[in-house]
Curated annotation (Swiss-Prot):
Its EC number is 1.1.1.94. The gene is gpsA. Belongs to the NAD-dependent glycerol-3-phosphate dehydrogenase family. The lineage of its organism: Bacteria, Pseudomonadati, Pseudomonadota, Gammaproteobacteria, Moraxellales. It holds the Pfam family NAD_Gly3P_dh_N. This is Glycerol-3-phosphate dehydrogenase [NAD(P)+]. Pathway: Membrane lipid metabolism; glycerophospholipid metabolism. The keyword Isomerase does not apply. InterPro entries: 6-PGluconate_DH-like_C_sf, 6PGD_dom2, G3P_DH_NAD-dep, G3P_DH_NAD-dep_C, G3P_DH_NAD-dep_N, NAD(P)-bd_dom_sf. The active site is at 207 (proton acceptor).
Length: 357
């Protein structure tokens, strides 16, 4: 076994060969920290905004995020701040890595300080009650601001560890896509572009549902056949739902769709997978969330998507079975049983029109 790492095989970024973009990440969770660290490593003048002054001071002094990424040394040039105006005024890109339930509140708070900055969501969720995507919230609260969303198979610990990864920046603005690629693209982190904002955003939000399902099923030691069936039928559900909302189904064949789905459904590092595994092991929802200690967007997404799927008459048996297990006390094995019930005959439904039986 060799001790050679991927980071040993690539040349470090030569800072003076890059234009130093001024980048801020709002939110000091695991993914926000990973993106801030990556931008810093790429030569950007980077700040990370954290509500807790004590936590910000600790990051500046120790170069560790002890709460969310305690095993990884952060770039010493990364500056943590708790002053929101300082964090966003006169910056080039603002990445927002705030949980969906607080996303609108924070975007409202920064609005007085926003001029020409690009706002990019890192949040994979849907706002409760309104069914608004994070891009919708940005458009509503900051109507004149260029915006985008970043999504893909991006487990924070792997990114910070320097393992090769890829993501998608979706925006209607070519300038936003280019700026984000400039800030984050490196030899170990590829940033692909897309103009299907809602498609990319939906992939990131919906896959959290199926990560919970996979974690729950894994607690029962299911076989590889069942795992494969869950993932592929999950992709069918995602694309069915997305098409109803106007997204391009082909987006779901990329990194932000099947890529993110595969990574999240197969990794114990995934927060939503951990929640599902805990539920499948007999814990209550409150116990599972408390043990995780972080936000798992999938729980809220299940509620929002099930409600909208009923309104739109979209066939989503896995999502419906999950809702019944988590909120109505049905046995977790109902997830697997839901896949075996009569439904759509066709496999790839946006290629072959489906028929119900």
């Amino acid at each position: 076994m060799t001790d050679l790492k991927f980071t040993d095989l690539v040349e470090p970024v030569v800072i003076d060969k890059k234009t130093a973009l001024r980048v801020t990440v709002l939110g000091g969770g695991s993914f926000g920290t990973a993106m801030a660290n990556l931008a810093t490593r790429n030569g950007c003048n980077t700040m990370i905004w954290i509500r807790d002054q004590k936590m910000a001071d600790e990051i500046n002094q120790t170069h560790f995020n002890q709460r969310y990424l305690p095993d990884f040394n952060l770039e010493p040039e990364l500056k943590a701040v708790s002053d929101l105006e300082l964090a966003v005024r006169d910056r080039d890109i603002i990445f927002v890595a705030i949980p969906s339930h607080s996303f609108r509140e924070v975007v409202k708070q920064i609005s007085p300080y926003i001029t020409a900055q690009a706002i990019v969501s890192l949040t994979k969720g849907i706002e409760a009650n309104t069914f608004s995507f994070m891009s919708d919230i940005i458009r509503e609260e900051l109507p004149e601001v260029p915006y985008g969303v970043l999504s893909g198979p991006n487990l924070a610990k792997e990114i910070v560890a320097g393992m090769p990864s890829g993501t998608v920046i979706a925006s209607d603005s070519e300038l936003v896509r280019y700026a984000v690629q400039h800030a984050l693209h490196s030899a170990l982190f590829r940033v692909f572009g897309s103009d299907d904002v809602h498609g990319v955003e939906l992939g990131g939000a919906l896959k959290n549902i199926y990560a919970i399902a996979m974690g729950m099923a894994a607690a029962y030691n299911i076989g590889e056949n069942t795992k494969s069936m869950i993932i592929t039928r999950a992709l069918a559900e995602m694309s069915r739902f997305a098409v109803k909302l106007g997204a391009n189904p082909l987006t779901f064949l990329g990194l932000s769709g099947v890529g993110d789905l595969f990574a999240t459904c197969n990794s114990p590092l995934s927060r939503n997978y951990q929640i599902g595994y805990a539920l499948g092991s007999g814990k209550t929802l409150d116990q599972a969330i408390k043990a995780l200690g972080q936000t798992a967007e999938g729980i809220n997404t299940i509620v929002q998507v099930r409600t909208r799927a009923i309104e739109l008459d979209v066939y989503m048996p896995i999502t419906n079975a999950l809702y019944e297990v988590i909120f109505e006390g049905a046995p977790p094995l109902n997830i697997a049983l839901a896949l075996m019930k009569n439904g759509h005959r066709s496999d790839v439904e946006f290629v072959l029109p489906h028929h119900q039986v």
